[in-house]
Amino acid sequence: MAKKQRNEIDWTDEEEEIIWVSKSEIKRDAEHLKKLGASLIELNSANLAKMPIDDTLREAIELAQRLRLEARRRQIQYIGKLLRNVDHEPIQEALDKVENRHNQQQALLHKLELIRDELIEQGDSAINPLVDEYPTLDRQHLRNLIRAAQKEKQANKPPKNYREIFQYLKSTIIEQN
């Protein structure tokens, strides 16, 4: 019987499950980790402190934030390499939470703009449901702002009260949330 070489794989062994990973898949994973590293570099120090990363990775990210151009690119490569050695899923989840908080704030501001436009178009009929939903709103102050914004719109004046309605809604509703 021929002697089995040390590096040769025994294809008859059924107990061992061999998972083949293509070179392209390895490259895609490495590219994904580099993008994750680049996203971490863009975070400010407060958000970076919330990330579940070790000290070596944190120092590499802080160094990359100070570097420019080619040195930064090489540092991102290095951060990607460090990310290959750690479980990157908790880091990705924490990053998604930080980015999603920004998206939630943008959605809230967009909602406030729609509420403001609806208030100006419909007047008093739109105030009651809004005050029911947000009881901290001052109904009389809101009516005065809406009336002034409607007059500005008819007279083609600059939208001072239009912006003031938005600021009032923003300060009151965000404070309540």
Swiss-Prot record:
Subcellular location: Cytoplasm
Gene Ontology biological process terms in this record: assembly of large subunit precursor of preribosome
Keywords: Cytoplasm, Ribosome biogenesis, RNA-binding, rRNA-binding
Disulfide linkage: none
Keyword Cell inner membrane found: no
Matching SUPFAM superfamilies: PSPTO4464-like (SSF158710)
A molecular function GO annotation: rRNA binding
Gene Ontology cellular component list: cytosol
Role this protein plays: Member of a network of 50S ribosomal subunit biogenesis factors which assembles along the 30S-50S interface, preventing incorrect 23S rRNA structures from forming. Promotes peptidyl transferase center (PTC) maturation.
Family: Belongs to the DarP family.
Protein name from the UniProt record: Dual-action ribosomal maturation protein DarP
Gene: darP
